[in-house]
Amino acid sequence: MFHNFHILSLSSYAYNLFFASAGMLSSLVMFFKFGLYELFIFTLFSVLFISFAWGKDIAMEGLSGYHNFFVMDGFKFGVILFVFSEFMFFFCIFCTFFDAALVPVHELGETWSPFGMHLVNPFGVPLLNTIILLSSGVTVTWAHHSLLSNKSCTNSMILTCLLAAYFTGIQLMEYMEASFSIADGVFGSIFYLSTGFHGIHVLCGGLFLAFNFLRLLKNHFNYNHHLGLEFAILYWHFVDVVWLFLFVFVYWWSY
């Protein structure tokens, strides 16, 4: 019987990703509580590996002609819902931040940021990271417009991936040199929760871009059919916008 839906073949990726994600969240709690980071690193890479394997299968389905326009509309709606859920996640984090910052309690000295904390200078490493991330947004947009014009976008994609890796490296360096930890009161908790989860999103977004760059090298995309790359670019711009809010409020306004 003819229909517009693509009937999926049997796959264990959904179950594997569920258990790997549950293990990652559980190991994250253990890391916060006991400082055991090895299991978290293992489960994080398990999630990334399963996601790449699943994405490869989806890409092969598209190349085989199973993804008609009706199916692609479903993908678009799913990605919009996913980005909206990510937006709500960071919205909750910012609600927590403003609840603590606008009405600081007596235990914090009734001031924000808490008295006695040596914070990161926003016009040092954070400003550099802002320039790097915004530059990566420019280069990935350059790559997109080059592809739409049926031109080569290899150099701009390589530059975007390098900037993403550079941002992650500088963020790790900032954590190692910071004078406070996640256990230093409400500010330390919110700071590392917000910037840490954003860093994970940058890592995932950079890998997503790298995955699509490999597909680009294999000629999986053309100027009018590159949905996977568009999803990666949309996600990357979302990461850019979240960082701007983090820089303005968590770094600059709190300093």
Curated annotation (Swiss-Prot):
<dbReference type="InterPro" id="IPR013833">
    <property type="entry name" value="Cyt_c_oxidase_su3_a-hlx"/>
</dbReference>
<keyword id="KW-1133">Transmembrane helix</keyword>
<feature type="transmembrane region" description="Helical">
    <location>
        <begin position="190"/>
        <end position="210"/>
    </location>
</feature>
<keyword id="KW-0472">Membrane</keyword>
<dbReference type="InterPro" id="IPR035973">
    <property type="entry name" value="Cyt_c_oxidase_su3-like_sf"/>
</dbReference>
<feature type="transmembrane region" description="Helical">
    <location>
        <begin position="77"/>
        <end position="97"/>
    </location>
</feature>
<dbReference type="GO" id="GO:0005743">
    <property type="term" value="C:mitochondrial inner membrane"/>
</dbReference>
<keyword id="KW-1278">Translocase</keyword>
<dbReference type="Pfam" id="PF00510">
    <property type="entry name" value="COX3"/>
</dbReference>
<comment type="similarity">
    <text>Belongs to the cytochrome c oxidase subunit 3 family.</text>
</comment>
<protein>
    <recommendedName>
        <fullName>Cytochrome c oxidase subunit 3</fullName>
        <ecNumber>7.1.1.9</ecNumber>
    </recommendedName>
</protein>
<feature type="transmembrane region" description="Helical">
    <location>
        <begin position="34"/>
        <end position="54"/>
    </location>
</feature>
<comment type="function">
    <text>Component of the cytochrome c oxidase, the last enzyme in the mitochondrial electron transport chain which drives oxidative phosphorylation. The respiratory chain contains 3 multisubunit complexes succinate dehydrogenase (complex II, CII), ubiquinol-cytochrome c oxidoreductase (cytochrome b-c1 complex, complex III, CIII) and cytochrome c oxidase (complex IV, CIV), that cooperate to transfer electrons derived from NADH and succinate to molecular oxygen, creating an electrochemical gradient over the inner membrane that drives transmembrane transport and the ATP synthase.</text>
</comment>
<feature type="transmembrane region" description="Helical">
    <location>
        <begin position="231"/>
        <end position="251"/>
    </location>
</feature>
<feature type="transmembrane region" description="Helical">
    <location>
        <begin position="156"/>
        <end position="176"/>
    </location>
</feature>
<dbReference type="GO" id="GO:0004129">
    <property type="term" value="F:cytochrome-c oxidase activity"/>
</dbReference>
<keyword id="KW-0496">Mitochondrion</keyword>
<dbReference type="InterPro" id="IPR000298">
    <property type="entry name" value="Cyt_c_oxidase-like_su3"/>
</dbReference>
<feature type="transmembrane region" description="Helical">
    <location>
        <begin position="12"/>
        <end position="32"/>
    </location>
</feature>
<feature type="transmembrane region" description="Helical">
    <location>
        <begin position="123"/>
        <end position="143"/>
    </location>
</feature>
<comment type="subunit">
    <text>Component of the cytochrome c oxidase (complex IV, CIV), a multisubunit enzyme composed of a catalytic core of 3 subunits and several supernumerary subunits. The complex exists as a monomer or a dimer and forms supercomplexes (SCs) in the inner mitochondrial membrane with ubiquinol-cytochrome c oxidoreductase (cytochrome b-c1 complex, complex III, CIII).</text>
</comment>
<dbReference type="InterPro" id="IPR024791">
    <property type="entry name" value="Cyt_c/ubiquinol_Oxase_su3"/>
</dbReference>
<dbReference type="GO" id="GO:0006123">
    <property type="term" value="P:mitochondrial electron transport, cytochrome c to oxygen"/>
</dbReference>
<keyword id="KW-0812">Transmembrane</keyword>
<dbReference type="InterPro" id="IPR033945">
    <property type="entry name" value="Cyt_c_oxase_su3_dom"/>
</dbReference>
<dbReference type="GO" id="GO:0005739">
    <property type="term" value="C:mitochondrion"/>
</dbReference>
<keyword id="KW-0999">Mitochondrion inner membrane</keyword>
